[in-house]
Regions:
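Edge strands and adjacent loops of beta-rich recognition modules
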Residues: 54-94, 162-177
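Polysaccharide-binding surfaces and accessory modules of carbohydrate-active proteins
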Residues: 1-81, 123-156
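Hydrophobic residues positioned within well-ordered beta-strands of beta-sheet architectures
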Residues: 12, 98-100, 112
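Beta-strand-rich interaction surfaces with strong enrichment in secreted/lumenal proteins
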Residues: 86-89, 99-103
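Generic structural hydrophobic/aromatic packing signal, biased to beta-strands
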Residues: 28-30, 46, 98, 114, ...
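Short Pro-Gly-centered flexible turn/kink motifs
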Residues: 102-118
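Extended Lys/Arg-rich polyanion-binding regions
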Residues: 107, 142-177
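Residue-level preference for beta-strand/loop junctions
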Residues: 94-96, 108
């Protein structure tokens, strides 16, 4: 349960196993159930690259290796330029991090898209990873999300700037229809 996860976060993390899928540049994380009646949850994190890549995709699922000894999120060792470790499996404190070096010519264009989701089966996680590894699928999804957001804003009678005020918690002065 959520309350058990909050009470014992380290214990809860012991039930997460990570796996890298090279064919779709994705990490999937399966949370092993603690009880027979508990459903299994799967997270998927996938990278899509539209442009010229340089070298292989790198990944990290161990927070301690990502941060480094004595370092924190503001200055992780992962940003020092060294290759990521490629750790997977049952890690003590799981994260998902994908990295791809790119080559960008002067005036060139490269689009990197990261998609993250939660599903209830490994098969669904694999399907999402395969689908969103395709740059055109990621671009279509972002375009559809933008279109839906614009329709919602029109329906509410607010501008995108006013919507941003809501997101930032500054909604006192914004009135809708």
């Amino acid at each position: 349960s959520v309350s058990e996860d909050l009470t014992h976060p380290v214990f809860s993390k012991l039930f997460v196993e990570t796996e890298y899928l090279p064919e779709s540049a994705a990490l999937i994380c399966g949370r092993r159930p603690r009880a027979p009646d508990e459903p299994r949850a799967w997270a998927v994190h996938v990278l899509s690259v539209d442009g010229r890549m340089q070298g292989p995709v790198e990944w990290e699922t161990d927070r301690a290796r990502f941060l480094g000894r004595g370092r924190g999120p503001e200055d992780p060792v992962a940003l020092d330029g060294r290759p990521l470790s490629g750790t997977t499996g049952a890690v003590l404190d799981p994260i998902v991090s994908l990295r791809q070096r790119i080559r960008l010519a002067p005036g060139g264009f490269v689009r990197l898209s990261f998609s993250t989701g939660m599903v209830t089966t490994r098969e669904s996680a694999l399907a999402i990873a395969q689908k969103y590894h395709d740059p055109s699928a990621a671009a279509r999804t972002f375009a559809l999300a933008f279109t839906q957001t614009q329709g919602t804003l029109r329906h509410l009678g607010i501008t995108s700037e006013e919507a941003q005020l809501f997101v930032n918690g500054e909604s006192r002065g914004v009135k809708t229809k």
